[in-house]
Amino acid sequence: MHNYSVYGRRKLWKAARRAGIDAGRDQVARLMAAEGLRGASRAKKRFTTKADPAHVRAPDLVGRNFVADRPDALWVADFTYCSTWSGIVYVAFVVDVYSRRIVGWKAARSMTTALVLDALNMAAWTRRHAALDGLVCHNDAGSQYTSIAYTDRLDEIGAAPSIGTVADSYDNAMAESTNALFKTELHRNPAALAANGGPWKGLDDLEVATCGWVSWFNTERIHGELDDRTPAEVEAAYHRAHPRTEAA
């Protein structure tokens, strides 16, 4: 039962029950204590946002209300940085608010428009069979997200841009939460570092590990905000209940 060694006792108990293991919550807590295990704690956010005053900013269409009634109604996007032996690696994510699924991501050595644009393009490809008309894509006011290339691509896929403020985590809270989970569960996770054979060497090994973590995050990691289901399970349940919304 792989979980990157990040689950606390409640989530590990839930995961055990999902796996058919008949263990009580107190029993799980005792076993964790006996083995010296504890859940991962998230690190404090450090801001990487740099606004460009020359760029035209879209309005904030979200207003900190990160709620959606279906997949592909609202995406949030952001990027974070990771230290490695060979320098900083930046990782960008695009997250579907309804299911918390990471629909697009990209790792690169510089925080350019290409970084966030590639993550957006992956998201569009991931949802290539879905109708994206009516989609809102919310970001902070970083220059990468207000660039002409990025906003033009949003227009091409039928998404409306929404921009929060600079260096305010509440204005892009769900994206910030995903960044924090990534840093805690992969980049700074002792279990992940051990599996890597030591500290991250650079873009290549971190990129491969990120690919594995994103797959686990989407299909195996249970989320308390999703009633202890995975993003894939939440989307599958939606499409079973709304078969007509799926593209032919």
Task: Name each region found by the language model.
Residues M1-A248:
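Charged DNA-binding/catalytic regions of mobile-element recombinases
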